[in-house]
């Protein structure tokens, strides 16, 4: 904690106005500058593993990397990893789901209009392969299908709500799945980016459900990088940011190659 406090003397800068889709060539922050061009496997992104229906080991490895990067808000590199998973196993429905997932909005940036068509296409490919997926994967696919329209809408709010509702159904069906809890939590965060608490410290209407999902995920897997990441964000402006401190203390060591995750504990430490 001391290192972070010494390095951080001001609030983090406001997030950028837009994020480019996963197909753009800008180097992601979590990838070292000397990394070779093109897709590359990294061994410093942590040990988070989600078994998928594919029997192809390369598809599994790329899927895990994509999920780790998505939880670390490296959406471009996550998209590249999910694309490699699809190359390894074109019939992997949940790999197509991953490609669709990371093209959507997040708490820092809205979905860019150019991402609408590729996100829709990837979601529809996942849907076409749905019968090859496990029951929990099928619910994740159904949720991501609900998240997108074929063309960018004037107002994304109904789609974001439909996605959150579908993820709530997934949590109710699979409450012991930490990833599903974390994804549901993120879907709620996307309904109210950076507005989880009012100026006088009152929780926003969706915040109790958000906290419950993340705290459940942390009980299921205390080292879940996505759960810790989002819990820091969900509590940093709360009346009690200290509740995230034990989790923040572990995060950087869990994924030392994920630049965004390495800096995240400072969001909590600055509030103590």
Segments and roles (model prediction):
Residues 15-26:
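Juxtamembrane proline-rich low-complexity "stalk" or linker regions positioned immediately after a signal peptide
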Residues 5-7:
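C-terminal motif of bacterial Sec signal peptides marking the signal peptidase cleavage site
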Residues 28-176, 183-223, 228-251, 255-258, ...:
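Short coil/linker segments at helix-helix boundaries
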